[in-house]
Curated annotation (Swiss-Prot):
This is Myosin-11. PROSITE patterns: MYOSIN_MOTOR (PS51456). Gene3D superfamilies: 1.20.58.60, Kinesin motor domain. It comes from the Eukaryota. Residues 1-65 form the Myosin motor domain. Keywords: Actin-binding, ATP-binding, Coiled coil, Cytoplasm, Motor protein, Muscle protein, Myosin, Nucleotide-binding, Thick filament.
Length: 65
């Protein structure tokens, strides 16, 4: 029916798409975002040449928006 939501179906879609798991993780206090410098330090080894080694703060702002 138009304009009607099936609560069970909505909940099932949220569960299947991982939304409920993400909410559960956030409620436990785990961060859902990290700053670019931390991301770069953690994952640089996977693609060392793909992430530029920039020192200019204006460039960092582009990555952290």
């Amino acid at each position: 029916r138009s304009g009607k939501l099936d609560a069970f179906l909505v909940l099932e879609q949220l569960r299947c798409n991982g939304v409920l798991e993400g909410i559960r993780i956030c409620r436990q206090g785990f961060p859902n975002r990290i700053v670019f410098q931390e991301f770069r330090q953690r994952y640089e080894i996977l693609a060392a040449n793909a992430i530029p080694k920039l020192r200019n703060w204006q460039w960092w702002r582009l990555f952290t928006k």
